[in-house]
Structure formats: C-alpha cells, structure tokens
Curated annotation (Swiss-Prot):
Gene3D superfamilies: Rhodopsin 7-helix transmembrane proteins. PANTHER family: SERPENTINE RECEPTOR CLASS DELTA-51 (PTHR22945:SF33), SERPENTINE RECEPTOR, CLASS D DELTA (PTHR22945). It is found in: Membrane. Belongs to the nematode receptor-like protein srd family. This is Serpentine receptor class delta-51. One of its GO terms (cellular component) is membrane. It is a multi-pass membrane protein. Keywords: Membrane, Transmembrane, Transmembrane helix.
Amino acid sequence: MSEVEKKLEMFVTVYYSLNVTLALSINILLLFIMKTTKSSLLKDMQYYLFNTALFEIIVSLSTYFAQCRPVANKSTLAVFCHGPCKYFGKNTCFVTFAVVQCSVVAASFSILLSFYYRYRLLKVNFKKKHKHATTFIIFSFFPTVMLLFQLLTDSNFAIVEAETREMHPDYDYVNNALIGFSDSKSPAAIIAQSLISLGVYMSPLIAFHYRRKINKILSTNTGQRIPVAYCKQLINGLLIQTLIPFCVYIPPYSYFLYSQLSGHSNLYFEYLLNIFGSFTAFINPLLTFYFVLPYRRALCKKVFKYFPSISEEGTEITTFPTTVQFQRGHTASTKF
C-alpha cells in the first residue's frame, strides 16, 4: 500500500463517518418537520419530498457501509470496499455496492418525480392517492431494473482479484474487501452501466424541460391555485438539487467511463466517484429546508427559537386556501 492510498483511506473513513452522521440527522429532522407541519401550499407534495429524503437516507447508509471505490481494469471492474461491509463477507459488499449505485440514481430520479408532480398539479387535477401510487411504481421501475442487471452481472471475484493485482500491485489488498465484475464487457454489465449513465446524464435535461414547462404555465396564467412566488422558489430549489449531483458527479463519473475504455485508472478519481455520490445526502435536505417555505418557517419556529442570534420574525406558518385565486402582482413577500 502506498503512502498516498493510506492517507486517502484515513480521509474517506472520517468523511463517510461525518457524512452519515450529518445526513441521518438532517434527513430525520426533515421527516419530523414534514410530519408536524401542515400547509395547503404543499398539498400532496410532501409525499414526493418524503420519497427523496428516504432515498437520501439509503444513500448515506449504503455509502458508509460500503465505502467503496471502483477500479477499472482491462476486462474486469474491481471494487475496493473499506467500510464495515468487509466484515460480513464479499457477497455483502457486492450487494451493498449495487445498492449504492442504484440509490444515488434513484435519489436523483425522485427529485425529477417532484418536478413531474408539480407540473401535473398545475396542468390538471392530480391529487388522487392512487395516481400517486401509480407514479411512484412507474418511476421506481428504472432503478429496480438497474439493480437487477448489476446483481446479474458476472462476478467471479477470483478473476477480478487476479487481474487487479497484475495491474495495480501497489494497492491495499489487506484492509479492503475486493469484489467486482469479472466481465465488464458482458451484455448485463453494459446494460447496467448504460442505465446508470442514462440516469446521470439525462436528469438535468429532464429537470430543465419541466422547469421550462412549469414557468410557461405560471407566465401564461395569472390566476393560480398556489402563490406564484412560492411555486417558482420551490422549482428553483428542485432544479438546484438536480444540478448539484450533475456538477459534482459528472467529472469523476466521466473519467470512470474513460478508465473503463482505456484500462487506466487514477487513485484520486477512484475515491472521488462515490464521495461525490454521497455528498448530496446531507446537501439536498438543507436545500429542501431553504426552498420549501413552510418547512423553513417550521424549522425556525421549532428549532432555531433556541438560538437568540436568529430572528423569529417571519417564522409563522402561513397557509393559503386552495380556492383563492392569486394574482402575480398580489403575491405576498415574506421576510426571512
């Protein structure tokens, strides 16, 4: 094991511990605020925000449990797992790695689902619970298929280890569990990788598409069932939540695809891939608190009231009847 890898292992151990602590704390707080805050501004939007928070919890737990980094070889894909999963066997690490990949994409898709719901709510009446259930089932199909193809990909760990030791003899094989895919060019592996790539690269484009459609509806209709300013702020928050993974995850993921084709790998990028994938687990709930006004006010009223330095002005929970028609020029401004 090189000195650089030793330092990186120490860093990621500390990072994943902090990440899972922050992510669980903030997401559980968000779920508590969701449960105790009632506002007609949100309607059934809380189901979709709850869905995102749930996937972020899965992302934080699975990335901490695995602490994995993929290493591209010529014909195989190796995965070094430094997390607690290594104490439960290689098969446990293999399943956890598949869950990590799929949960990151599923969390991103859950934000797109919120975009879709907001668009449908403005376009047509979309409030029946069975319609929500149908939508969740349809959108869960993509991550589920991705997970199945990952689990069905050839995974002869002995073949993976033999090629990895040949190409990367200086890596740490003592303190990590080595798993991976023995044939990275097989149909199942290609399909799984294509689905992940599709989810990573297409999410921002889909988000921009629905943002444009929603803004078009808001600009062409002066009367809305919800305040225009609130809706625009919510949509901007969802867009930022979609773009953050795009900005931080695309560079290392693109290099990972390149390394699979070239057979060359960089130690730093290997670690960065899943570090950036887990980064949003505690960032997204913070953005939800900021951009979803009823939750921000509830947070200030129930939590920040214990901190004298934070003003309580404008923290009351305000709800709006759904039957009232709001004009753009009469949208109330809120102090924060």
